[in-house]
Structure formats: structure tokens, C-alpha cells
Amino acid sequence: LLGIEAVRPGGHIGDIGEAIQSYAESERCSVVRDFCGHGVGKLFHDAPNILHYGRRGEGAEMKPGMIFTIEPMINLGRPHVKILNDGWTAVTRDRTLSAQYEHTLGVTEDGYEVFTHSPGGLDTPGIAFEREPASAE
């Protein structure tokens, strides 16, 4: 979740992308470039686009009150995807595994606030595998 940790007033949108890309590539993964996060404002998919790759210091400056999503897709193989005939489903072209997460957050005066926390803790890495399955009562 290094992309989230890059959110701060005075930072730039490229800081988020650089954090995600540099970590993914250090783990021999790739970042899909066909999709991006987005601002949440008068429109749900509003400006600015939040790229999950990039260079620190580039892009719009983050300011308190900005609300946006960070939602990278990380592939074990190459970054290329294709959309299936249903017009919605994205798969990797090289048939490798891919993972995606999405959080909505806001820039605060001194950092950020994540708005998409799970009350049950399911947003914590690894938690889905550590919990016992819910009973089917």
C-alpha cells in the first residue's frame, strides 16, 4: 500500500505512481497502464486521473480536500491486458496472474484518510487467509 503512503499535501500525483511502480517492479511484477484511479467530485469518475506508474514530482499537486481512488492492477507477467467479449472482464494477455485493489481516500492537512476501511479488518493484507470462515447460520 505504498501508493497510499505517498499521499500528502504538497506531494504530486506522480509520487503515488512512482511508489507503486517501483515496488511492483522490484518484485518482478508489472503495473497495468490501461486503467487508472480517478478523482471523486461532482462526477464519480472525475479528474485527476491517478496513474499507478510515473515519476515522483510529476502531475497535479495534492491539496487538502482532494478525494480520489488508488486502484492498481499488478501482474506477475507483462503489463498488457485485453478485454473479453463481455466488454468488461480484463485478463492478462500473457495469461499470468493479476491482482487489483481499490481504496478511496482524501488528502488531509497533514496526510491522508482512507475512506474504504473494512469494519471486519478485511482491508488488512493477509487477513482474508487468517480468519476462520463465517458460519452459514
Predicted features by range, described:
Residues 1-137:
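Active-site neighborhoods and metal-handling regions in enzymes and metal-associated proteins
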